[in-house]
Amino acid sequence: MVSTRKEGASAGEPVTGARVLIVEGRYYEALADELLAGARAALEAAGATVDVITVPGALEIPIAAEIALEAAEEEDEPYEAVVALGCVIRGETYHFEIVAGESSRGLMDLALAHALPLGNGILTVETEAQAWERARVGEGNKGGGAAEAALSLVRLKRRGLK
């Protein structure tokens, strides 16, 4: 049997010249600051150029990303990847499920429709304490993790299946 498995590009390999869009929901501003710091550090360390746009919350992230992607294409300055950052903390109503599910679905639809490398750093947690455990730079920052996921996909896309 012939194997068609392709190994991904090495983590940490530079992505010089990659233009990456971060879309951050700022409903929880202090958490957003931490997630952004982690994502920006990971992207800049890899040699990517970073643009940031902000929206009120997680539910607005997918459409904001779509609008920005279209505008960048029209200006002939396309983005190679998107990193979504935000936080949804469960409350007493069904709103959590709607925001968490629909923001994730919207991002996945966007990524698949455009073959777009995307890192989803929208935290979906039960408590604010859980959010902080996942947001603090130096303590498992999921913003940096989402950026690394997007970078991994950029490397894979650049490499293709050669």
From Swiss-Prot:
Q: What is its EC number?
A: 2.5.1.78
Q: Which InterPro entries match?
A: LS, LS/RS, LS/RS_sf
Pathway per the UniProt entry: Cofactor biosynthesis; riboflavin biosynthesis; riboflavin from 2-hydroxy-3-oxobutyl phosphate and 5-amino-6-(D-ribitylamino)uracil: step 1/2
Q: Which Pfam families match?
A: DMRL_synthase (PF00885)
**Biological process according to GO:** riboflavin biosynthetic process
- Detail which positions bind 5-amino-6-(D-ribitylamino)uracil: 27, 58-60, 87-89, 120
Active-site residues from the entry: 95
The record lists (2S)-2-hydroxy-3-oxobutyl phosphate as bound by: 92-93, 134
Q: Which GO terms describe its molecular function?
A: 6,7-dimethyl-8-ribityllumazine synthase activity
Q: Which GO terms describe its cellular component?
A: cytosol; riboflavin synthase complex
Q: Which reaction does it catalyse?
A: (2S)-2-hydroxy-3-oxobutyl phosphate + 5-amino-6-(D-ribitylamino)uracil = 6,7-dimethyl-8-(1-D-ribityl)lumazine + phosphate + 2 H2O + H(+)
Q: Which keywords does this Swiss-Prot/TrEMBL entry list?
A: Riboflavin biosynthesis, Transferase
Q: Which family does it belong to?
A: Belongs to the DMRL synthase family.
Matches recorded under PANTHER family: 6,7-DIMETHYL-8-RIBITYLLUMAZINE SYNTHASE, 6,7-DIMETHYL-8-RIBITYLLUMAZINE SYNTHASE DMRL SYNTHASE LUMAZINE SYNTHASE
What job does this protein perform? Catalyzes the formation of 6,7-dimethyl-8-ribityllumazine by condensation of 5-amino-6-(D-ribitylamino)uracil with 3,4-dihydroxy-2-butanone 4-phosphate. This is the penultimate step in the biosynthesis of riboflavin.
Q: Which NCBIfam families does the UniProt record give?
A: lumazine-synth
HAMAP family the UniProt entry points to: Lumazine_synth
Name listed for the protein in its UniProt record: 6,7-dimethyl-8-ribityllumazine synthase
